[in-house]
From Swiss-Prot:
Crosslink site: Glycyl lysine isopeptide (Lys-Gly) (interchain with G-Cter in ubiquitin): K117, K175, K178
Gene encoding the protein: Mcl1
Protein name listed in UniProt: Induced myeloid leukemia cell differentiation protein Mcl-1 homolog
Marked site: Cleavage: D108, G109, D138, G139
Ranges for region PEST-like: 85-156
Organism: Mus musculus (Mouse)
Amino acid sequence: MFGLRRNAVIGLNLYCGGASLGAGGGSPAGARLVAEEAKARREGGGEAALLPGARVVARPPPVGAEDPDVTASAERRLHKSPGLLAVPPEEMAASAAAAIVSPEEELDGCEPEAIGKRPAVLPLLERVSEAAKSSGADGSLPSTPPPPEEEEDDLYRQSLEIISRYLREQATGSKDSKPLGEAGAAGRRALETLRRVGDGVQRNHETAFQGMLRKLDIKNEGDVKSFSRVMVHVFKDGVTNWGRIVTLISFGAFVAKHLKSVNQESFIEPLAETITDVLVRTKRDWLVKQRGWDGFVEFFHVQDLEGGIRNVLLAFAGVAGVGAGLAYLIR
């Protein structure tokens, strides 16, 4: 009985790793067991055999230590290893960003954009032609702009001078008496016609022009150049005529007045260049076929009724002998 109780005490002490529970204390049971195992090793010259009645019991971890997860796989235990901590979130985000913006083999030569940026509001300019969906025999679009050496031709220079002069006159509210240079006599007639027809278009469509101006929201030169999108949209259906052209130039003059009112006169010339670029470089074939500005004058030619009436009255005054008084009143 005593032997059984003694073995139980030794077993309990060995399990708990503490001192002997017997009265008087004595040496720890664990120490005695280690000594006996060492003695058996020395006598046997090999591994110590387990003592009779001794049981192999796993020693629990120290108080406060985390129990090992024996069910965890090798991969899970690896991730929990203190020496292999997870990458901080900010470093992981930076790595992901670098991977996104620099896959040169997938971008096919395109330059990556910085993350978080949107492409500047982008110039969505389309080149419109009378055959927008058909290509030429050489594979190029009929509306392909001319090479740089052909851009500054007579039609372009004449058009730019007429349109620029009209926009400046509308902005200042006064006619420029200086003769046209490149445009010559034909340009002078075209400018006079544009003044007459364009002024009428602005009067008749002022409300619509105001709405279009608000949508453009012009604040800088880049916004001025976006005017080309309005022109492209107008010609998107492939229909070109002088009515549309004069309406667009008239709206350009309306915009020029606005630029003058907000002290942005320096944008008027870029506006005139934008209008000329779209008209001449995308509608060149049509303009040449219509004989350019001579055709414009002929299309909007209106018989000078006031001049005709004046001539009739003067002739009547001379025949009837009414005298110089009537001639003065009707001249």
